[in-house]
Amino acid sequence: MEAVAATAVEFWDARYEGETYAYGTEPNAYFRQRLDALPPGRLLLLAEGEGRNAVYAAKRGWEVTAVDFSDEGRAKAQRLAVAQGVHINYQVGDLTTLAWLRPGRYDAIGLIYAHLAPADRQAVHAAAAASLAPGGHLLLEAFSPRQLGLPSGGPRTTDMLYQPAMLAEDFAGLALLENYELGVVLHEGSCHAGPANVVRLLATRDSNSELTYSI
């Protein structure tokens, strides 16, 4: 699997390099709502960016591991963590290499606007499912194809956008508790602002299920 293109890394480093947090410092609303209903444990956040969700979770008592390929994103996340008086384990790396894969390790995994090309998406989602501990939960929010044409953020190509049926297939080994599309109004910094169309998923790994993944 090829590593993330240098142009993508440069794009995200440029977006994160300023003092202002591009997506704000408050957690995603759906992530916060669902995480608050779970007992703290080990949490993995993929494509975590500037750390807003990681820092919130750490304040709630979670042991947080975050992964993103942007050094600038990590620097912003660490500054936010220090300001909020918490610690997060933030690793810089390419999600698509699956170096973060730890079968059965995490009590919760968050993918908040972790948009990937189809081949990479399927592999990353399968690895994320395998990294859940029995009884663990996976939380996802992403833009749907109906987001095209709206100025509130997201990829500009359909193949990078997610639909409930697609996610049901990707996470077929998990028990799906929620998987739906809806319209929302985003208030997440300057880069996620205004009316938007998103898909939300909450899934759990059954205690007796066997999910394996090898690189």
Where in the sequence are the language-model features?
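A short acidic, Gly/Pro-enriched loop at the edge of an enzyme's catalytic core
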Residues: 100-108
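Conserved class I S-adenosyl-L-methionine
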Residues: 1-38
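A short SAM/SAH-binding and catalytic strip from SAM-dependent methyltransferases
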Residues: 107-121
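Short alpha-helix
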Residues: 159-181
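Conserved SAM-binding strand-loop segment of SAM-dependent methyltransferases
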Residues: 84-96
